[in-house]
Each structure stands twice: as structure tokens, then as C-alpha cells.
Amino acid sequence: TEEVYYEISDPSPEDDVPILLNNKGFFRLFEPIMRLYMLPKYNELDLTPFFAPFFMLFFGLCLGDSGYGLFMLLAVTVYRLVAKNIAASMKSILTLVQLLGASTMVCGLLTGTCFGFNLYDIQVPFFQSLKEAISLDNQQMFNLSLILGGVQIIFGMILKAVNQTIQFGFKYAVATIGWILVLVSAAIAFAAPGVMPMGGTVHLVFLVAGLLMAYLYNSPDKNIFVNIGLGLWDSYNMATGLLGDILSYVRLFALGLSGGILASVF
């Protein structure tokens, strides 16, 4: 008789395990974009559902022209109506382009840009009422870009804490949670001093608690002095890196503005 030996074991972090993304509906449309980058490991979060809304919004802000967005939406819609035997994979890509076109159209209405011209210069009651309702000037668009950058960075840190908890255990996420407390409390104190005054008792409680978590649990397996040293180093990286990361979101505003200028020239 022949004998067969087999062994069943959980994969180790070093194993190269095949990855199958499992998203539904709206989020599945963004899987091709996710595949352009590194796929998550089997024991990591699939970030597709979390980056999809941001990608859609940022695409619209970068293109920032309601005329281009309307053209994308209508062109793909007409193609889907007249084309025959469209592959399933192509259908999802076409739907994604329609969504990105709709996002571009909506974001273009924030500035009134349509093929390089300003819709809100047209003295028609509909456009003027739309201008009063949703129009943003350059300074407001600049501020919106910075706010969106701050929101996405903090949201990314929350996902990082969740990922650390899944992979290594909660204690490895404590330092990240501490930095989240520091940043969120500072943002609230800056934006809404009436709710939480900057340097007030409530703000200081969150600040001290967050820094203690960040300094004492930076690397839970090491001693307290190493943790404090690593925490100080992280403070430097946080101060310099965070400023650069948030300012990089100004490119959303700059790309939309430059696109409108180029369209008006040509």
C-alpha cells in the first residue's frame, strides 16, 4: 500500500500566500487600482474600501472641470449603450470611469469651471443660485485641500492601528493610538477653541495621555528607556513628516487650478 503524509498549518508571515480580494459592489470597482500597487498580505486589512471614496474625490478635485467630467460620463454611457458583448472586466472599468466623471463634474461645480470657462460668469438665475449654494473661491479650495489631507492622514493612522492590532496584538497599536489622540485633540483645539481651548485642561489631558502612550509603548518588547528614545525620534519624524504630508495635498488645489488655466488657453 502507498502512504501519503500531509501537514496542515497556518501560514507564517514569511510565506508568500496568494491573495484574493473580496469586495462587493462599489468597492469592487476600485480593485484594479489597488492591484497597481502592492496587494495586502493575508493577515492585513484590504484597504480598497477605505481608499476608494478618497480616490474618487481626489480625482475629481485634480481634474476639477465640470465639462470634462460631463464628457467622460456621457461618452462612456453612450459607448455602453451602443457597444455589444462588453467583457465583464471592461464593464467594471467603464462604470469606474463614469463614477470618476461624475466626481469631476461635481468638483468642477465648486469652482464653476467648464472647459476652462467660468459658468458663474453667465448671468442665468440657475447658475447664480448654484454659485451661492456651493461655489468656493481659491482660498476656500486651498483650505479644503489641507483639511482633506489632515482627515485622510488621521484616518490612515486609525487604519494603521487596526492593522497593528490584527497582526501583532493591541499593545503594538497603543503608540499609534497615542499619536492619534495628540493630533485629533490639537486639530479640535485649533478648529473649535470654544469646544476644547488650546492648552486648556481637557486638551492637556488628551495631549499628556497621548504622549505617554506614544513614548512608553513605542516598542513594547524593549525597555522603557529605549521606548522613550524611540518616542522622541518619532516626535521629530511626526513634526517634520506631518507638515510635508499635509502640504502635499495642496497639489489637489494646484492641479485643478492649472487644469482650468490650460483649458482656457487652448
Residues of each region from the PLM?
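Conserved, carboxylate-rich catalytic/transport cores that coordinate ions
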Residues: 3-266
